[in-house]
């Protein structure tokens, strides 16, 4: 599993996805991120994601984003787990 610190993430690297629920995302989030809730992302990855793009996943505690990275890697996506988010 590839990892990166949130402070090292730059928009040019790829798309930053916050997998928290919309309410938690609205309360506080990285301004460079887009919100795609964990369940929605995993159920609809084939229509939401492009295997030719790079994705960086974050959440508040790291559990869901880490789990999502493992699953999406299995499906062949270029995903990186963002730590210290």
Residues covered by each model-derived region:
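Conserved beta-strand scaffold positions in the cores of enzyme catalytic domains, especially
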Residues: 16, 33-35, 79-81
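Flexible, polar/low-complexity N-terminal or interdomain linker segments that lie immediately upstream
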Residues: 1-30, 38
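A generic structural signal for short beta-strands and their flanking turns/coil linkers
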Residues: 15, 32, 51-53
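Glycine-rich nucleotide phosphate-binding loop and flanking beta-alpha elements
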Residues: 23-25, 42, 63-65
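A short, gly/pro- and small-residue-rich
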Residues: 34-40, 75
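Short amphipathic alpha-helix with an adjacent loop that forms part of the alpha/beta core around
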Residues: 7-10, 41-51
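Short amphipathic alpha-helical segments
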Residues: 28-31, 69-71
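Catalytic cysteine-centered active loop of the rhodanese-like fold, especially the PTP/DSP P-loop
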Residues: 46-85
